[in-house]
Amino acid sequence: MARLKVTQINSGIGRKQNQRETLRSLGLHKIGQSVVKDDKPEFRGMVNTVSHLVTVEEVD
């Protein structure tokens, strides 16, 4: 299964509550922090919710 590396590039301050909660659910707390997760539909949905706050790249 493919894995995705998600990096937070913008702050969640001043964003809607669901976007802030999604960042926390992804395990992101600081700008520049990255997490690597399995590529699942649930994960993709969370990334789409905060796509303007994160970057995504595939990792092997």
Swiss-Prot record:
The keyword Ribonucleoprotein applies. One of its GO terms (cellular component) is cytosolic large ribosomal subunit. Coiled coil: none annotated. One of its GO terms (molecular function) is structural constituent of ribosome. Pfam families: Ribosomal_L30. It comes from the Bacteria. Keywords: Ribonucleoprotein, Ribosomal protein. GO terms for biological process: translation. InterPro entries: Ribo_uL30_ferredoxin-like_sf (IPR036919), Ribosomal_uL30_bac-type (IPR005996), Ribosomal_uL30_CS (IPR018038), Ribosomal_uL30_ferredoxin-like (IPR016082). Part of the 50S ribosomal subunit. Belongs to the universal ribosomal protein uL30 family. PANTHER family: LARGE RIBOSOMAL SUBUNIT PROTEIN UL30M (PTHR15892:SF2), MITOCHONDRIAL RIBOSOMAL PROTEIN L30 (PTHR15892). This is Large ribosomal subunit protein uL30. It comes from Kineococcus radiotolerans (strain ATCC BAA-149 / DSM 14245 / SRS30216). The lineage of its organism: Bacteria, Bacillati, Actinomycetota, Actinomycetes, Kineosporiales.
